[in-house]
Amino acid sequence: MSKFFKYITYILFTLCILTACKKEDEGKNPVSDSVRISAFALKADSTNIENLDKVFFTIDLEKGLIYNADSLPRGTNVTELKFTLKTENASEINITTADTTYNYLKNDNLPNNLFTPANIEVVSQSGSYKKNYQLKINVHNLNPDQLYWGGVQY
């Protein structure tokens, strides 16, 4: 029994030494293939409406949609809203409006009229993958504090 225990100890010791001496790949940085937008938020702007930075946005990764489920108040001027978005090491974030494309990572001063339905294209760090997102900011069409009886026939 002591010989068996001795051999098992040698084998375990040898395995520990061999695995501890395994050389790791040095100089290689892993490249991300993620095209996920992990966060989207409006920047605070008290001249437009209060608490803009607290508006919750839904990011639907399967359908490629970014939208606010709870609409902004009627009369909100969406052409003056600024935003931030976060990705996981994207190499490019291209935002396309009606006629122009902007690189979000290279251009800090995006135009004010960005929020016509905009398309956001995220390119992975490796450049192998692309994902398109549709940005839609919902605003109330009617004043929720008033009753509308137009179009009702008796």
What are these regions (language model features)?
Residues M1-T9:
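Bacterial N-terminal signal peptides that target proteins for export
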Residues I17-A20:
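C-terminal motif of bacterial Sec signal peptides marking the signal peptidase cleavage site
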Residues K22-Y154:
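Predominantly extracytoplasmic/ectodomain segments of secreted and cell-surface proteins
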